[in-house]
Amino acid sequence: MFISISAGIVTFLLTLVGIPAFIQFYRKAQITGQQMHEDVKQHQAKAGTPTMGGLVFLIAAVVVSFLVALFSKQLTNNVGMILFILVLYGLVGFLDDFLKVFRKINEGLNPKQKLALQLLGGVIFYLFYERGGDMLSVFGYQVHLGIFYIIFALFWLVGFSNAVNLTDGIDGLASISVVISLSAYGVIAYVQGQMDILLVIFAMIGGLLGFFVFNHKPAKVFMGDVGSLALGGMLAAISMALHQEWTLLIIGIVYVFETTSVMMQVSYFKLTGGKRIFRMTPVHHHFELGGLSGKGNPWSEWKVDFFFWGVGLLASLLTFAILYLM
């Protein structure tokens, strides 16, 4: 535990120092910041804010995790594969951000390109990950999936990678939501005695807390796809490494809700010829524009943040109740 906490502190400090340096470099190089293409008027003031800040906490967490795991003899297959997903999905996000920021391609990678790269990473993860079988744990019951586990693994990794990406829409929301999710998995890893996984979790929590110092409203930097895609893939990989895949549906309810809102909105829009369920999706924008009902007073970003963080925290506590009390 001491080693894991120490790794978290080091990553926190590295990110705390690294982000200001990153922002300064961004400004001096006169790199065009985040472009705003949303209908939320108050977001237009954020145009030009440095993005790709996730690169800082990602590098810090990966390097610290690797070195500490190596010297403490905890560089297991679990650690290696979680770090692999972080690096690969981070690279996908970096390429997406790079095209948007430097090549001025608003779309970045097109959906097919992004999906292909994410699937490639998922296949490599599956081939090298030593699970010890293709069993899926569902509420304590073991379900043998056989060859179909690879389909599940790809769906899980790609799905949650993109889900966290959708959640990263207002200042601080994704960073602390993931801190809450990682903390929940930290408890599960500790109970299982998987200190190697706990090490990586603490390292990333430290990095995210250091990043949040500059990402809370008003954000001085955004994590970009390089951060959000990597974090979503990490959560999926950790749930698989702990053999508690189903828990991510509850622990990650915020990301599930965000993604489902987009799917519902698009489907309903097509079926009804232009009608909408929500004011705007992902659903955090719906709350921004008109509160819970979408027709009331607009919520501040802080209010939306605390609402979603609260939901994530309660969902984590519910997961513990199901796992350890029921």
Swiss-Prot record:
Its cofactor is Mg(2+). The keyword Transmembrane helix applies. The chain crosses the membrane at residues 3-23, 51-71, 79-99, 115-135, 138-158, 169-189, 195-215, 221-243, 306-326. One of its GO terms (biological process) is cell wall organization. The keyword Membrane applies. Its main location: membrane. It catalyses: UDP-N-acetyl-alpha-D-muramoyl-L-alanyl-gamma-D-glutamyl-L-lysyl-D-alanyl-D-alanine + di-trans,octa-cis-undecaprenyl phosphate = Mur2Ac(oyl-L-Ala-gamma-D-Glu-L-Lys-D-Ala-D-Ala)-di-trans,octa-cis-undecaprenyl diphosphate + UMP. InterPro entries: Glycosyl_transferase_4, PNAcMuramoyl-5peptid_Trfase, PNAcMuramoyl-5peptid_Trfase_CS. It is a multi-pass membrane protein. GO terms for molecular function: metal ion binding; phospho-N-acetylmuramoyl-pentapeptide-transferase activity. Its EC number is 2.7.8.13. GO terms for cellular component: plasma membrane. It comes from the Bacteria. Pathway: Cell wall biogenesis; peptidoglycan biosynthesis. Keywords: Cell cycle, Cell division, Cell membrane, Cell shape, Cell wall biogenesis/degradation, Magnesium, Membrane, Metal-binding, Peptidoglycan synthesis, Transferase, Transmembrane, Transmembrane helix. It is found in: Cell membrane. Belongs to the glycosyltransferase 4 family. MraY subfamily. Catalyzes the initial step of the lipid cycle reactions in the biosynthesis of the cell wall peptidoglycan: transfers peptidoglycan precursor phospho-MurNAc-pentapeptide from UDP-MurNAc-pentapeptide onto the lipid carrier undecaprenyl phosphate, yielding undecaprenyl-pyrophosphoryl-MurNAc-pentapeptide, known as lipid I. This is Phospho-N-acetylmuramoyl-pentapeptide-transferase. It comes from Streptococcus pneumoniae (strain Taiwan19F-14). The gene is mraY.
